[in-house]
């Protein structure tokens, strides 16, 4: 499916970026193929009017622990002991995986489309990656 995003405020992510208007973002099969003037003929594209909303590339988070929500801990805890306790039972593993999936969704809803995990529970991060890719 081809989409044309119109009437948006574009932030392109460059160092000295300025809001750009009067442009249209063309997407073919999930890939941005061009950014053209909004006067361009959009035949063959499903038009999505952004109604003046902002649009920008996905953010990248290069240091993620999906087993945590990113909030500061109120008290010190023994993470190694906690991980062993969580991984011991299929029920607690299932609960932990659901939490990890939720934290990944929080990243996505915050505009982060790419993450690099640097430690987590078992193989939860690769399992989640594979489920998303399927």
Predicted regions and their residues:
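A metal-dependent hydrolase metal-coordination microenvironment
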Residues: 134
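N-terminal metal-binding scaffold of metallo-dependent hydrolase/deaminase domains
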Residues: 1-42, 55
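Generic detector of well-ordered alpha-helical packing
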Residues: 13, 35, 50, 62-64
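A generic local structural motif
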Residues: 12, 47, 101-103
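Short, well-ordered secondary-structure micro-motifs within conserved domains or adaptor modules
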Residues: 43-49
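Metal-associated gating/positioning segment near the N- to mid-region
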Residues: 54-131
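Conserved acidic residues
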Residues: 2, 45, 113
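Short, acidic, Ser/Thr-enriched surface-loop or helix-capping motifs
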Residues: 5, 27, 49-50, 61
């Amino acid at each position: 499916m081809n989409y044309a995003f119109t009437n948006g405020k574009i932030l392109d992510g460059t160092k000295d970026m300025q809001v750009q208007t009067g442009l249209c973002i063309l997407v073919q099969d999930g890939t941005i193929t061009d950014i053209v003037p909004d006067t361009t003929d959009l035949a063959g594209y499903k038009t999505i009017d952004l109604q003046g909303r902002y649009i920008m590339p996905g953010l990248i988070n290069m240091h993620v622990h999906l087993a945590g929500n990113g909030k500061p801990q109120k008290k010190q805890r023994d993470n190694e002991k906690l991980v062993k306790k969580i991984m011991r039972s299929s029920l607690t593993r299932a609960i932990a995986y659901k939490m990890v999936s939720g934290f990944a969704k929080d990243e996505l809803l915050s505009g982060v489309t790419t993450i690099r995990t640097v430690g987590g529970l078992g193989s939860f991060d690769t399992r989640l990656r594979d489920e998303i890719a399927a």
